[in-house]
């Protein structure tokens, strides 16, 4: 199982989502930004690192929100979502084609990563 973290960054009742680069696995799908936890990392440290590497932003990782397990065709992931706050940095995309700020309801019209769907359901209820 692959352990993955995702950031739930909220500003003015909208959430940050990012579109995976077309050359990556599941390219073209939208997702909450984040990535894989490397050996020896806590989920929070991994998330701070991924957000800096992929979006060029410094963040403060907040509360754990939820986790979800998803089976893809060739692998299984456990996705852990955390609240995150952008502290500094201008968005520079290295792993994504674009970003968007959307409401939880608007996410339903985006081609979201399947692993993120349970997080969207949670956000819509809370």
Name what the model sees in each region.
Residues 1-16, 36:
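Conserved N-terminal beta-strand and adjoining loop/helix that marks the start
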Residues 9-10, 17, 84-86, 101:
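Conserved hydrophobic "DFG−1" position in protein kinase catalytic cores
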Residues 14-53:
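Conserved Nudix-box catalytic region and its N-terminal flanking loop in Nudix hydrolases
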Residues 54-61:
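Short secondary-structure junctions
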Residues 83, 92-123:
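NUDIX/MutT-family hydrolases
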């Amino acid at each position: 199982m692959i352990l993955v973290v995702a950031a739930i960054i909220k500003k003015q009742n909208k959430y940050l989502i990012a579109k995976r680069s077309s050359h990556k696995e599941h390219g073209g799908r939208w997702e909450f930004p984040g990535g894989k936890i490397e050996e020896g990392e806590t989920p929070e440290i991994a998330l701070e690192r991924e957000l800096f590497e992929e979006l060029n932003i410094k963040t403060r990782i907040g509360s754990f929100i939820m986790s979800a397990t998803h089976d893809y065709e060739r692998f299984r992931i456990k996705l852990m979502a955390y609240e995150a706050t952008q502290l500094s940095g201008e968005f520079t995309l290295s792993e994504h084609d674009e970003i968007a700020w959307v409401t939880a309801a608007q996410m339903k019209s985006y081609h979201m990563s399947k692993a993120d769907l349970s997080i969207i359901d949670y956000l819509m209820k809370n």
